[in-house]
Amino acid sequence: MMRLNWQIRQVQLLLERLGLQQLVWMDCLVMMLNKAIFLDRDGVINKRLIGDYVKKIEEFELLPNVREALIEFKKMGYLLIVVTNQQGSKQFLIFYNL
């Protein structure tokens, strides 16, 4: 349990250091046990398009510090899962790997 608490604190510190407190992720304990982080897409990991949503890779722009945070999370052994409720994802208009 002590090791788990240390890992949870490391995630919290990383988010604070990178200024990414707005990341949408599950309860820290559940996240640590399952080693997955769920991230919302538009406005959390990438720049939101006003009045629209990102449909093409050319429109996709990571927000500051996100790349570094994702790399650190991967190093810590997390599975990164990007979620979205954007209409295009249901219509299979959005296809790309980050």
UniProtKB/Swiss-Prot annotation:
Annotated InterPro entries: HAD-like_sf, HAD-SF_hydro_IIIA, HAD_sf, Heptose_bisP_phosphatase
Tell me the superkingdom of the source: Archaea
Named from the GO MF annotations, one term is: phosphatase activity
A GO biological process of this protein is:
carbohydrate metabolic process
Instruction: List the PANTHER family hit by this protein, alphabetically.
Output: D-GLYCERO-BETA-D-MANNO-HEPTOSE-1,7-BISPHOSPHATE 7-PHOSPHATASE
Name by which UniProt lists this protein: Uncharacterized protein MJ0015
Q: What is the lineage of its organism?
A: Archaea, Methanobacteriati, Methanobacteriota, Methanomada group, Methanococci
